[in-house]
Amino acid sequence: MRRFTVPCILRHRISILSGAGYSPAAARLSSLAQTSTPESVLPPITSEILLESIRSSQWHIVEHVADKLTPSLVSTTLLSLVKTPNLAFNFVNHIDLYRLDFQTQCLAIAVISKLSSPKPVTQLLKEVVTSRKNSIRNLFDELVLAHDRLETKSTILFDLLVRCCCQLRMVDEAIECFYLMKEKGFYPKTETCNHILTLLSRLNRIENAWVFYADMYRMEIKSNVYTFNIMINVLCKEGKLKKAKGFLGIMEVFGIKPTIVTYNTLVQGFSLRGRIEGARLIISEMKSKGFQPDMQTYNPILSWMCNEGRASEVLREMKEIGLVPDSVSYNILIRGCSNNGDLEMAFAYRDEMVKQGMVPTFYTYNTLIHGLFMENKIEAAEILIREIREKGIVLDSVTYNILINGYCQHGDAKKAFALHDEMMTDGIQPTQFTYTSLIYVLCRKNKTREADELFEKVVGKGMKPDLVMMNTLMDGHCAIGNMDRAFSLLKEMDMMSINPDDVTYNCLMRGLCGEGKFEEARELMGEMKRRGIKPDHISYNTLISGYSKKGDTKHAFMVRDEMLSLGFNPTLLTYNALLKGLSKNQEGELAEELLREMKSEGIVPNDSSFCSVIEAMSNLDAKKSDS
């Protein structure tokens, strides 16, 4: 309820007593609204009195009688306000609409949809949709009934319902509404369809995007430049760059001129695939069409070239056409330098960014912190964190996760758990990544019991573990030979519909080989194949290493041959494992032969390789001396 001052109360009374359409009942109601006690008896509330109160902005009266309003009275009042939807919206704001029945709520939404601004009705729709009390189909059907009561031809209400679902990232519900509109003969606007296509693209539901786009075409809903831009982006995501560029010709056929966004989308698509020359050709074409490249054009190219260590080429090109790096450019440069281990240059770009008047973002700091941890510069990372805190910047979930993971990777469980407690205190909820890092550090310290307890706690809170978390915990148990628990986790994964991958099976195979159960490990590879999971070079190296440690070089070489037949190239680990097996069996000549093969394949032997060969030869010499 709003509070009113004495002058405000007087104004309300005067406006009713002196205004047009004076009603004694309304005047008495206004007086009672200001002076009533729990025992006061209100006069009957009629539609006439309620409408007078609304039209004269006597909202204190509306608020006073709100809990006495029946759905029927509210509906009648709303229908009387169809031509003044702004008053209908104010009326709804002064009563508890959600105390009323679903039918009345939908009627209110339908009336308010006649406002020129879509924001009020969109907000109401979001509240109804997120309440989850009714299905989208029920909501749609009730809105159709409300729409029919208003006797209006406009179908904007249903377009807004679709857009509302898209804003809530409820893409399946948005698509359902689209087809319900089709059933009713309501044709969605192109902009509404673009909302669905955009969301499908963002969610990487590429196949669904093409099906929906085809249905748009069949329904003769015209595409505009935004539609084409979205579909060009979809093609770029698929890696179909030639087809994406071909859409420029299709746009011309439909008389739609590309915009700078069209060209920038293509440049980004080519750049993400490392097709820099193709991206440059598109830039040349856009220039010929009168478009000047901007930072959105060059930043994707800069990003790829940064990874290649060729950022200076792009910066020089940008400078030549008068483009100045923006905050996105600097963050790209900082990330590139950090990933390449050049932290000095990364911080130099940060300083240059500040000199140019740009404020470093969370992304900037998170990139630098991650880079410092990757280079084992823990103290420098802690200094940077203090700097961030001194600036009054509150750490976000990404920063906490980077820090926790950094400490976990370096085995500092104490600091990692302290940060976990701190983020909880700050009201930031830990994620799957947070708990995976903590489980990792516990397993690394052979504290698998504590890791299991943390895992059970996480699951108990309702968080569904992901594949990485399961693999991390499983690897911890495999490392200490606790294979019963490891296989029980595999069963839990099946129960939770978490599909294992090659990493899962490699962990189990490594654990079995560590226990000397080589045949079981081999059988596990068979199971892996039956489940449609392709073994990788790690799978084969694990078996080769296991057999070699046992001295079973026959089976080790058989696995190596199978590995070669499937197109996997032996690695340094493969050869070193085989050399250890030959050394164990005192097969010096074969070891020398394998060393020569290794060199011919372009694999440089390391100390371990030479030690195994020397040991094998020494054993062979000793064997010859004994004979």
Curated annotation (Swiss-Prot):
One Gene Ontology CC term in the entry: mitochondrion
Pfam families noted in UniProt: PPR (PF01535), PPR_1 (PF12854), PPR_2 (PF13041)
Segments annotated as PPR repeats: 154-188, 189-223, 224-258, 259-293, 294-324, 326-360, 361-395, 396-430, 431-465, 466-500, 501-535, 536-570, 571-605
Annotated transit peptide: 1-29
Sorted UniProt keywords: Mitochondrion, Repeat, Transit peptide
Subcellular location: Mitochondrion
Gene3D superfamilies, A to Z: Tetratricopeptide repeat domain (1.25.40.10)
InterPro entries attached to this UniProt entry: Pentatricopeptide_rpt (IPR002885), PPR-containing_protein (IPR050667), TPR-like_helical_dom_sf (IPR011990)
NCBIfam families reported for this sequence: PPR
Similarity comment: family membership: Belongs to the PPR family. P subfamily.
Protein's name according to its UniProt entry: Pentatricopeptide repeat-containing protein At2g15630, mitochondrial
Taxonomic lineage from the root: Eukaryota, Viridiplantae, Streptophyta, Embryophyta, Tracheophyta
